[in-house]
Design a protein with these regions (language model features):
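Iron-sulfur cluster-binding cysteine motifs and their immediate structural context
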Residues: 29-51, 56, 67-84
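ABC-family P-loop ATPase nucleotide-binding domains
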Residues: 91-102, 137-229, 240, 264
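The feature captures the beta-strand-to-loop junction immediately N-terminal to the Walker
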Residues: 116-118
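Walker B catalytic motif
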Residues: 220, 247-251, 257
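Hydrophobic anchor residue at the start of the ABC signature
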Residues: 234, 262
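H-loop/switch region of ABC-family ATPase nucleotide-binding domains
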Residues: 281-283
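Conserved catalytic segment of ABC-fold P-loop ATPases
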Residues: 290-297
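Conserved beta-strand-loop-alpha-helix hinge in the C-terminal portion
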Residues: 297-329
Length: 329
């Protein structure tokens, strides 16, 4: 195999994305490998056989010609050049030729952090990391770092202390799931019993009144509509006792009036004495403006990579998202 030249090595931030659902080596002519100029020169830039499950592209050896992207009959390949400034800011990568997240949003106590970005850009991934449900591998998916290395990586930032407290269970995180239509698959029983089982704060009555859940108490969860499931999910998260509250798309299925009431309920969990953290992923910009104290924008290419910006005040963050241009990047 040839050793990549110095000119090629400088493009180390180039990423190759292969969609595992679209890539079908057994049904195509392996065009990605056949037409690759690097492979023709004797370099293993693309490794794939008709018996392979998926094509594997070396990002270090790829020259970014884009021939494989054009030749793939299933449109399963994407080659993307990233700024070199992101080279050492990888927070997590799910595997070779898969989605990559750069940086993390930094929550602040007693404030609502809003996350805004298109679908598939890494918002839910960031939430899972901040909730302690996903261990960030800093881009090293073959030999993931230990927590000591991860904490050292975030040394000097507010995230170091936050992640350390999550690890030590000094902070307890609760997350409202994104896809509320899946709730009946995992939970059974009446609405009242489910809420009572999760009620750890003396706010159940107020939350049910605000979210208009009182008339649903005797219903089974599999009888609820999408909007009713959404309000129930918000309520179950809000009435629980936690240090970090996370709401993933709380406005979906709700009308305008219900969205504003849900926003008021979410802001009600802030506790200045305790130093509560609240993080919200929201696509409704009006609700995001009403709900948040500061905003982080996520940009990139859906399904390929996502980058978290520095925090902005709400107005600037929303304007940056709408303009599609980040002045600080």
């Amino acid at each position: 195999n040839r050793i990549p030249s110095k000119a090629m090595s400088t493009a180390s931030t180039r990423i190759a994305i292969v969609d595992g659902e679209k890539c079908k080596p057994s049904r195509c002519g392996l065009e990605c490998k056949r037409y690759c100029p690097r492979v023709k020169m004797g370099t293993l830039c693309v490794e794939v056989k008709s018996t392979s499950k998926i094509s594997v592209i070396s990002e270090e050896l790829c020259i970014g010609c884009g021939i494989c992207v054009k030749k793939c009959p299933y449109k399963a390949i994407d080659i993307i050049n990233l700024p070199k400034s992101l080279e050492n800011e990888t927070t997590h990568r799910f595997g070779r030729n898969s989605f990559k997240l750069h940086r993390l949003p930094t929550p602040r106590p007693n404030q609502v952090l809003g996350l805004v970005g298109t679908n598939g850009i890494g918002k839910s991934t960031a939430l899972k990391i901040l909730a302690g449900k996903l261990k960030p591998n800093l881009g090293n998916f073959t030999n993931p770092p230990d927590w000591e290395t991860i904490l050292k990586y975030f040394r000097g930032s507010e995230l170091q202390n936050y992640i350390k407290r999550i690890l030590e269970e000094d902070l307890v995180a609760r997350m409202k799931i994104q896809y509320v239509d899946q709730i009946p698959r995992h939970l059974r029983g009446q609405v009242e019993k489910l809420l009572n089982a999760r009620s750890e704060r003396d706010v159940l009555k107020e939350v049910c009144d605000a979210l208009e859940l009182n008339h649903l108490m005797s219903r089974d969860i599999d009888q609820l509509s999408g909007g009713e499931l959404q309000r129930l999910a918000i309520a179950m998260t809000t009435v629980s006792k936690s240090d970090v509250y996370m709401y993933d798309e709380p406005s979906s299925y709700l009308d305008v009036k219900q969205r504003l009431r849900a926003a008021e309920v979410i802001r009600s969990v802030l506790d200045t004495k305790k130093g509560t953290y609240v993080i919200v992923v929201e696509h409704d910009l009006a609700v995001l403006d009403y709900l948040s104290d500061f905003v982080c924008v996520l940009y990139g290419r859906p399904g390929a990579y996502g980058v978290v910006t520095m925090p902005f005040n709400v107005r600037d963050g929303i304007n940056i998202f709408l303009a599609g241009f980040v002045p600080t990047e």
